[in-house]
Amino acid sequence: MKKSKEAVFEDKDYTEENPEQIFGNLYDGKLTVQDGKVKIAYDGDGNGYYIAFNSETGVYYDPYGDTEYDISVLFDANGNSFVFADAPTVEVLAGEQEQTEAEPDYLQYVGNEAYGYYDEAGEWVWSGYFEGDQWISTLPQTEAEEKQFGFEDNIETTPTASEDFGLEADVPAPEVAEPSYEVQPEVAAEPVYDVQPEVAVEPVGETTATVEPQAVEIQPEVVVEPIVESQLEQPVEVQAEMVQPEVAVEPQLEVSLDPIGETAPILEQVEPQAVQTQPEIPAEQSAVELQPEPVAEVQSEMVQPEAAAEPVTEAQQTEPTPVVETIAEITPQVVTEPVVAVVEHQPEAVAEPLPVEPAVAGVSELIPTEQVQPEVVVESTPVAEVQSEMVQPEVAVEPIVEPQPEQPVEVQPEVITTPEVASVLEVQPENPVVEVEQVVEPQPETPVEVQPEPVVETVQEAVAEPTQVVEPQPQAAPQPAVYEWNLTPEAAPVEQPEVIPVTVVESQATATAEPQPAVAPVADMDYVLHLTDTVKNQPQTAPVQPTTPIKIEVAESTPTVTTSPVEPTIAPPLFEIELNNTTSSDLPLVEVVDFKHNQHGAVGTHSFDDFTPPEVGMESKTHCHSNSEVVWRVSEPKTVPVPPAVSSINIQTVNRVVEPTISTPTTPVVESAPAIEIFVDTPPVETKEASSNVDVVQQPVKPLMPVMVEQLRTTELQPTTEINLFANSDINSIIAELKQGRSNPAINFDDIFKMSSYQMVVKKSFVQISDFITNSKTDITNRFLLIKKELQAELTRLIEENEQLKAEFLNAKDLSVYQKDELLRSLSNDFTIAHRPSDSYEQLQKSGELVRNIQKAILENESKIKNIQITLKELKAVYKLCSDTVLNGMAKLDSVLRFNKKEKDPLLLNSMETLSSFETEPQAIIEDLLDFSSSFDKMSNEQLDEFVYQNLDSGLNLDLDGFDHQLSSMNIHGLEPLDPMKLDDFDFETLTPDKTSNLSSILDDELMENGGDFNLDY
């Protein structure tokens, strides 16, 4: 509707109370402001908007259009944030939605015969009606009750007690596991057991592994507890009803794995009476913190008749062995189940002594006598054979990581003889084996037939008397321990003993050594032996003195001694190292001589523990002079399989001096652990009889500043005495010559001040600087010309390629246009069927794809051409900057060589002959010399230049030309990154260029000008 000009532009007093005066009468039956459904909001500029709210979508929109608004950026008439007051909140909408969802959906009962039926026409007919949630049937009462029962049975399924118990039975909490035996018969009905059930170690959560202090001598019994009668009978009935033959009532096995693995849980079956009165295993009395432990994984339900136990270490034999009732003791109890699951993971028994409290419970008479496990006490013997009369599932226990010799434990498997379990074996393989993954140490595995104590019995002979050193006699070479590495595939892998006790007597020569003369007594010396454990960087309190390190590396069965003396010492201590093995095979001992040196050569021994072969790195340091010190580093390296090696140690004594001569076989280097140092402090030696004749291998001292050494090597400034003007090596002789007062001393000024040497060094320096600048300029020019040539060649190639692509593009475009016309023509006449327009369409598609590819290649080439042009421009600018830097260096060098020349040369006075006649004052002779009364830092540049650089260019050939070299073929890929600013490091800051110098002959101007021309237009 058009309005008159006066109606539109009439001057009226528009107010916010009457917005219709602004927008006119727009009411067409829609929402209006008067009914409260439409609000007015304003933006930041004062523009007004009609706002309505859609309760279904929650969107604010224009009621007279389709525009949606964000009210967070709008304001009301007072300038506050706009709020749509009548808009229902989100909570109200949510409540309505919940109310809508709460209404019963009666359509879900369509098709259920309890609520109706389908008539002949296929339409659903209700047999009653709903009052709220209540179904009221109009059928006869008996039928209605049955239907109602069916309805409730289909709609609501109340959880049974078995389901409630099934959910609780999987929880290993103690308070939940006790009442589980009261409703145990319904466990098999739980569908959760279709998946492999989690088997806990204990039927009662409270019966975790406890500790008893006096468990070293008395080993707890292996108790087999009966299962509840209801557990044996009820699962069969439930299985018959639920038709689940694979469901088995598994004894709840709770694998109590301590985070450190300090205790081994006790697996046992307890009667319900013992469950409720469990006095011996309260949680607070246990020395182990009770925590929910991971439940052992159950493999496919099979009876495992074999069990392979891990070797038992001797450390474990001397410590309490917790009772571990394996699944073998529990499997016969589940006599009514067709399938018996086997625990995959066996809890570890760690050799840390903790008090174990044996859990004893009564044995049920329901279990046959042949199933009862007798008391098994593990003897503390190297090989323990545990024969069990129970069904032993083959469960490989994880190896205990202990650096102790482990011995195998042979377990004799038994065959199930109970009639209940015999039925299980009928449907299962005869020998189902659960292969448990074993943690294999990086060591060669040995068969079960490992000798109990593989000790090299080569040092059982008596050591020399402490007060006397006798002549060593040849003896048989130590027999290395031989192991059979023939492992059969069926043999279970047994961990090799990590520690092979080795005994070495250093004072005795082996078969490969010749007899040596006896050692005479040495000076009286008292040594103090003390053992310290070094931790990483332990500071040494002894003073730093030249040392003689003796490194001894012992292989598996024989030692390896490496000697690297650094400096001869006075009266080296007579020492003896013996690696002795104890019968306990717990901790091998190292017997080290306590150095009690006296006039009679007495030698005593001390033994210390915490020494672990097979690989021992020992380092001996002996300080000379007053404080002699021997440091032995005994390290515990990681076990590395090393073939048995035989080493010979020859102790030679020459002139009362012990000179160790060691021949060692090559053995692998072992990564050593933190070392143990033995410091042997020795008092000063007063006698000179025991002089050392040890061969000294003096290691060269590494230079502190290899960079400076390299720089000096590349320069010609080798004579350092020429550089140092203040060297006082010959000044004393000069002074003595002058003091004699001779009329013609044989000394000239040059000898006094060494200026000739100085001049030669300076000249050589300038020659090197000149050569460096010349070579730098040549290198810069060659690099620039080569890069420029390659880039221009690439530009030419890209331009030619683009021209060819443009021609191909035109041809492909014409072809696509022709094919398009042909396709349209074939579709518009009767030739369509014979022409097969589908082929024409495919050809047109191929032509179009070809056109697009050519166009893409052209655009890429154009981008490359543009980038290369920009690179050439930047390269030219950088080249000019580098050239200017080199020119600056040349100008400074020229100014230095030609600055302020003078005719007189005071250094031409080669002798002091003129001083013979006192007609000339000495001050007048040396007036042209530099005044040395002032310090060097107070000299002016003019004085320095006048004194130093006079006539330096005489005979100095500085050929700075030669920049017109021809461009040689170079590989651009071998160039180093261009760094134009690196030449600034060679700037001479203390020198100023001569403004009058003419360097036009230094550079080839034509080369400089033509080197940066570019032909960037293509």
Swiss-Prot record:
Location in or out of the cell: Cell projection, Attachment organelle membrane
GO biological process, one term: adhesion of symbiont to microvasculature
PTM comment text: Phosphorylated mainly on serine residues.
tRNA-binding keyword on record: no
InterPro entries (alphabetical): Cytadherence_HMW-1_N, EAGR_box, EAGR_sf
Keywords in alphabetical order: Cell membrane, Cell projection, Coiled coil, Cytadherence, Membrane, Phosphoprotein, Virulence
GO cellular component, as recorded: attachment organelle membrane; cell projection; plasma membrane
Coiled-coil residue windows: 782-815, 849-880
Predominant localisation class: membrane
Physiological role: Component of the cytoskeleton-like structure which stabilizes the shape of the wall-less Mycoplasma. This cytoskeleton-like network of accessory proteins containing HMW proteins 1 to 5 allows the proper anchoring of cytadhesin proteins in the mycoplasmal membrane at the attachment organelle.
Official protein name in the record: Cytadherence high molecular weight protein 1
Natural source organism: Mycoplasma pneumoniae (strain ATCC 29342 / M129 / Subtype 1) (Mycoplasmoides pneumoniae)
Lineage: Bacteria, Bacillati, Mycoplasmatota, Mycoplasmoidales, Mycoplasmoidaceae
